[in-house]
Amino acid sequence: MEKFLLVAAEEKGISPDIDELKQLARTAGGVCVGEKIFKLKRINPAYYIGRGQAEEVAKFCEELNAKTVIFDFDLKPNQTRNLEGIIPAKIIDRTRLILDIFSRHAHSEDGKNQVELAQLEYLLPRLTGKGVFLMQQVGGLSLIHI
């Protein structure tokens, strides 16, 4: 079983439902080895949580040998990339976790196609690298291999 570290944020005095996130992680096939809840005064545009908090998560992740960090909020593509630069584990936000769960449990062809479409729509703004470079260079989709 994959080891998950859960990260949630208390914003504007509203406490997160960490138990729900734990259940989602279990449904995805993992085991929760730790959790961090941060009180946020404001959302950091670069990391969502603060940089110091991200470094704290990285240290906690290494101590617990967690392979995945699940954030109980939606991360923008740049926030995910920035967190990946600090935290030595796979970064998953709430939406991706839920899409992964649906993917595992879809049985009909229609269901599988709908989940795949949702996953691709989620991943599209997060694509960086050679494929995007080639698309801009040539102007066609035929050179992109995902």
Identify the role of each PLM range.
Residues 97-115:
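Short alpha-helix plus adjacent loop in nuclease-associated cores
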Residues 102, 137-138:
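Short alpha-helical scaffolding segments that buttress acidic/His motifs in well-ordered protein cores
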